[in-house]
UniProtKB/Swiss-Prot annotation:
Coiled coil: none annotated. This is Ragulator complex protein LAMTOR5. It is found in: Cytoplasm; Lysosome. It comes from Xenopus tropicalis (Western clawed frog). Part of the Ragulator complex composed of lamtor1, lamtor2, lamtor3, lamtor4 and lamtor5. The Ragulator complex interacts with slc38a9; the probable amino acid sensor. Component of the lysosomal folliculin complex (LFC). InterPro entries: LAMTOR5. Pfam families: LAMTOR5 (PF16672). Belongs to the LAMTOR5 family. PANTHER family: RAGULATOR COMPLEX PROTEIN LAMTOR5.
Length: 91
């Protein structure tokens, strides 16, 4: 599984507008990262979708947390027990 995850991270980074990607487990431990997102971001990245899910009354909703700045956007979404963050620059 680790090799498959690393391959997915590398494939994601091939998009020229993506400058970082991070995958964490449900405990906030980094499972893999590339580019601008590093292991030190794993805890914060993993908790944000959990808080966002508390803002909806529909338990089947899967929120996407978007952190925007003048330089880009970080999109974060939880999938089962994994959380994925993608850092994309704006052109």
């Amino acid at each position: 599984m680790e090799a498959a995850l690393e391959q997915h991270l590398e494939d994601t980074m091939k998009n020229p507008s993506i400058v970082g990607v991070l995958c964490t487990d449900s405990q906030g431990l980094s499972l893999g990262c590339c580019g601008s997102l590093s292991d030190k971001h794993a805890g914060v990245i993993s908790i944000l979708p959990q808080y966002a899910a508390k803002l909806t009354s529909d338990p089947t909703d899967v929120p996407v947390v978007c952190l925007e700045s003048d330089n880009g956007i970080v999109m974060i979404q939880k999938h089962d027990h994994l959380t994925v963050a993608v850092h994309k620059v704006t052109s």
